[in-house]
Amino acid sequence: MKKKTKGLKTQKVPWYGRRLNVYLLLIGVTVLVYFRVFTLGYTMLDDTIFIKENQEYNKSWSNIPVSFQRGLFNPTGDSYYRPVFLVDFIIESKFFGTSPAGYHFSNLLFHVLCVLLLYFFFLRLKIPDLTALILTLIFAVHPVLTQAVAWIPGRNDMLLMIFFLSGTLLTLKYRETPKWQLLVAQFLILLLALFTKETAVIIPIIILAVLKIDNGKWKTENGKFNFLLLLSWALALVIWFLVRSAATLKPQDFTLTDLLVNGFNRAPVLIQYLGKIFFPFNLTVFPDIRLIAPWWGVAALVLLIGLIIMSRSYARPLTWIGLGWYILFLIPVLVVPASLNDQVFEHRLYLPIVGILLVIGQVSICLSSMIKDQGSRIKDQGSKTKDQNPSNSSSNSSSALRPLFVQQVRQGVIVFVLLLFSGLTFYRIGCFKDPVTFWTAAVDGNPTSAYARMMLGLRMTEPAQMKQRFEEAYRLNPNEKMLNYLIGKLALDDNDIPRAERHLKKELEFSQIPDNYFNLARVCFLKNIPDSAAFYLEQVIRLEPRHPQANHNLLLLYLQLDRRDDARRQIQAMRDKGLEIPPEVTGRADLQP
């Protein structure tokens, strides 16, 4: 006998509750906003180092383990340790070679993956479907994250986010189903995160806080579960520390006091970054903390505090987790010494911005609840009034419409913000089109940077324009590394020997550039000081042993100076290096060993 179903109603699932619809929307919006990245080239800010200059390094699979034993930019004289980043370029070089388009494609792919993982993460935190979708869309199109996606080296922050979110999702799954496979998987992913960026040491703190909440409230976890998880994290940290300690990195001479002083001096960055999240109108590709107007940040801070108080979301744990998330992931930016990096690049907000989105999500949930409660009260009050005085029905109807109006206004604001952010991001992608465009934007956004003007000068094709940019940079900072070398090289090309010598010698105070020594050798040769020329050529070979022209010229110079023993040693050294020896030298009997 069939059961009667007449009168039963099935609740219709809204479009944002259908997962496939949401996935397609998130992917579609992200690709639509960022499709311009396929037209981008290099910026000449580190990207060519990892792809072009490291071309030989990237060719060999055997350099994958080597990447865990060296620094990022230099095998021995570097403070940055990013082995996963180097390994990524080794792998991708097999597919893309030195074509920037392929690396821009993978950057976009990483961003899409981060967007999807973030949406899953919000849902796992029991954030309502529509709120999770809106927060994820804001992340996907936010202008402050443009550099992370459009600038090829910005991928490191995206890789860290991928490992962080996937590891957190696995840990949350392990809480529900404590299988050893999940425990091992999250352990391996944490290791990858640590070898991606040192910031990953903060990840266990954030995950612990997330594990302590359930349906928006604090809870106590099983002791055995926590012990196994903590043990796996401790093991990952020990392995990372030991491997990193064995790497050939440049020793750091700053103390804990130095880090604390740096953190105090750079604390305004927290407010400046907050301003860029809420009001992304003062963005630049090469920012300087001293030039960023504080007012946007102060306004954003006041707005955030006001929203938290007004919505009473301060009672929700995720609000505090979000604030802690934002601050903790920015600590490395605060304490990094200016000698290592003095720029407050916007791609570093890729992970911290999620903390602010969590706070905004809690504010939204609380405000929605307040509007819903207000609507229910008005409806109940209207029903009572109608029973008592039917003539006031029109007044009751207008009161009931108020929550609906507020809801419509909020929806309009969300759509406007998403469209505005998408437009700003679409426009900003163009700043990364090519070196001239990028460094022009850098100078416009940071006019006091000698480095930016120097790099723009290097991109100029006309010597007069190049010279003008170098002179502008010199007026800003005569001690800028590499600048005196470039000015001296131009002066040498113009046959201005005294000026060339002055600048080339000054560069020795700041750097050890092989070509700088080579040009000093040219100066000495033109001044007919062969002994000094030989000295500078020896320095070139010390720094770059296989420099062909330096080896060739030094050999001929030894012969000119009648330094036959030195000439014999130089001939043998060139043979050992596989360098060609001039034919007029090889046949001389007096130079045979």
Question: Model-found features: residue ranges?
Answer:
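C-terminal luminal/periplasmic domains and tails of membrane-associated envelope-modifying transferases
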Residues: 1-9, 13, 373, 380, ...
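Polytopic membrane enzymes that build or remodel cell-surface glycoconjugates and lipids
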Residues: 2-372, 392, 396-464, 471-486
